[in-house]
Amino acid sequence: MQTDDDIIVYRLAAGCDLSDVEEGKIYLGKVQGFATFGMFVQLNDRIKGLVHKTSMKAEHKEKDSVLVRVRQIRPNGNIDLEEQLIKIYQVQQVERMSTTVRIADLPTKLGKSVAVEGEVAQIKQTSGPTIFTIVDESGTQNVAAFVEAGVRAYPEIELNMIVKVIGEVMMRNNQLQIESDAISALSGDAEVAVRTRIEQALDARAEPEQIKPLVKSEVLDALMPEMRKVAKIIRKAVFTAQPIILRHHADADGICSAVAIEQAVVSLIRESGGDFDADYFLFKRAPSKAPFYEIEDITRDLDFALKDHVRFGQKMPLVILTDNGSTEEDEPSYKIASVYDIPFVVIDHHHPDATIDKYLIGHVNPYHVGGDFGVTAGMLGTEVARLINPSVEQHIKHLPAIAGVGDRSEAPERALYLDLVRDQYSEQACKDIALALDYEQFWLRFNDGREIVKDVLNLVGNKERHTKLVNLLVEGANTMIEDQMSACMPHVVSRTLPNGAHLFLIDVEIHAHKFTFPPPGKTSGEVHDRLCKQNEGKPVVTIGFGPDFGVLRSRGVHMNIPRMVRELHNEVPGGGISGGGHLVVGSIKFVEGMRDVVLEALIKKISEASVQQ
């Protein structure tokens, strides 16, 4: 005989519909309203029935909880209910009978009701529904939930929660979307099981393919484990809908490195599903004026990231630094970012400082494996990009050659990358593209110029437009360089140092055009190139200086500019000295009133360096 303890009362979950209701069973409901012929009872937000006045057994008011038995479900969907008075019973939740599917399988479920389990990657409130971005082991999908226009649906659901979504697969604006009936947070063993399943699957999915570098190189072979690690981190960020900020030095080498990675990441974002324009708000490439991550850079990036986190419910970003990020000059920015637990990976060829790695989760640098700055950031970035998404290889394999000539690499890898694309791009063509990049980026300032840069690098497929654009940019750049050189070269001062090095000095503040192309750094480089040709086979050092800075270029003198700058910082009190760069190419900053003292101390150090015989 059944006792009250054995009586089961069913509670319909939010996503349940009429197909989940059974005649004869008792359900927990809520009084919705009254009519002359009875009382309307809601079993959930979607289902209601009528308790005829002859079947009512107690007095009620709106929103009272009641127990009702389903007497009949009519062909038209109306439900006849009968009130039940039971003091002791057990409540059992009824979940909607929906098949749990992977996000990757949703295109085959159009028009059907499904269940999806995954992690909340983004919560965006629109003027209409709330859009939840859900990530599972197979992909990313938007879920629309609507209460009323502009009102946050399911406020209890937060970022990074593991949830179960029940809803119908629909097409909205030619884009797949789940229109939710119910979203519930999983907890306990169910949450752990789903999170573990997703983590394990994503970890395997993020593993890069086993591929070799484009060219034969001991340095690149030795760097492959770290490049694979960095590529895996980036791939996992894409698969979990984590925003990515890519910062790079604003020269040809840095641009080539960053654009190679950009092509790989953007194409991977598009392949992973989600919004059709996800590559624009989940990925941002930004040039840095200095060859290190300045306070100005981290301030801008943090400002954007925090606003996007608050306004659009995005995760905090993964930051990729390329052609910068390896030196002590980057440390103040890393310290600020660490307050917000922002992860960093670095792909750089500047001489690294040991204190930096504690801030990074991945660091590709040729110095770590016995290489040097001749293996440029553009070469490294392209190899990492191939690991991120091998399908972009044919589009980007010319970028290392451009980066190598643009950064004046003398490493054997430069010639190998040039040989790789010689049938399409001559060495002169690569030099022209590198110059065009430098020239165009000067006018772009802090803008990435995504589409213009793609045309300069011939990534769009319009060869005729690429050729016309590069020719125009090179013509403009060379004209301005010649104007600058005609103004500068007569004012170069020469000295012969005790070690036999030929030192040349040019005050670019008073003997060069300001606020135009080429800027002081490139002006100093162009002066240096001309002086090297005039002094073929001799050790040459060029310093282009202004009121509070100096730019160094060297050939045949064994200097270590970062170390020299650190030593001068300690040896010249009141100099306010900072700077760095590569071993033989770099810059130094100081206070204006100490310029002469600092420059003489710098020249003394250069004179103590050994020279190439």
Task: Please identify what each model-predicted range represents.
Residues 199-246, 254-255, 263, 267:
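An N-terminal, well-structured beta->alpha segment
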Residues 345-346, 350-365, 560-574:
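Flexible glycine/proline-rich, aromatic-decorated loop/lid segments
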Residues 206-217, 276-286, 505:
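Gly-rich Lys/Arg/Thr-decorated short loops/hinges at beta-loop-alpha junctions or inter-strand turns
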Residues 239-246, 250-252, 354-510, 527, ...:
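A structured phosphate/pyrophosphate-recognition subdomain
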Residues 52, 142-143, 362-371, 383, ...:
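Short beta-alpha connecting loops at secondary-structure transitions
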Residues 1-117, 122, 126-130, 139-150, ...:
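Single-stranded RNA-binding regions, centering on S1/OB-family and related RNA-binding modules
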Residues 144-146, 253, 267-345, 352-355:
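N-terminal small/polar loop signature for handling phosphorylated ligands or for N-terminal nucleophile
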Residues 502-613:
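Glycine-rich, acidic loop segments that terminate in or are immediately followed by a histidine
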